[in-house]
Amino acid sequence: MERWATFDCYGTLIDWNGGIGRVLERLFGAARGGELLHTYHELEPQIQREDPGSSYRDVMAIALARLGAPADEEDALARSLPEWDPFPEAPAALEEAKAGGWRLAVLSNTDRDLLDASLTRMGVEFDRTVVASEIGSYKPSPAHWDEFFAQSGADREQHAHVAASLFHDIAPASALGLRTIWINRLGEEAEPQPDVELRSLAGLAESLDALVA
């Protein structure tokens, strides 16, 4: 029986806060850029709810416009996104899971070309990818998981979802009755409780094996 691990990408595998933060600091200065990162966190899901069919590239541009970025810089996040760094432990953790027989998939609130560029930085081949731009929906809507299970034929009892965002991933996956591993990089409080909590992806393969026997 195939075992599947699905992942969010940005914030879980790729340093989302670091990538966005650098762009905001360049556009608005170090002090204000740091303050605006929190506002950006609130704006992005709001824009996605307003138009679930919009591309992630457009979502980022609209968010920057609402923050007051110059018109010729509204594509700054999309331009920089392919250069955002993986978390240092991510490639090795994925390699270890894959070597242990896990099939890997990414469920991402982004566009196909942007995700493909990011995943080339991981050095690991993923077996499936589901992106918002192709299904017309953004997490926390369950459509990403619906599409993944339809494509892969995976057994839900042989699956776990791994992510850093409670709002976008852990809460909706838990509501679907799926096993979850929360990558709690910021030491936050969890509601709902994930099945497993890690501070990074280090030790992921061991946790997956223990969670899905």
Q: Which residues are covered by each model-predicted region?
A:
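N-terminal helical cap/lid subdomain that shapes the substrate entry/recognition surface
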Residues: M1-A92, G100, D111-D116
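Asp-based, Mg2+/Mn2+-dependent phosphohydrolase catalytic module
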Residues: M1-A5, N17, P91, E95-K98, ...
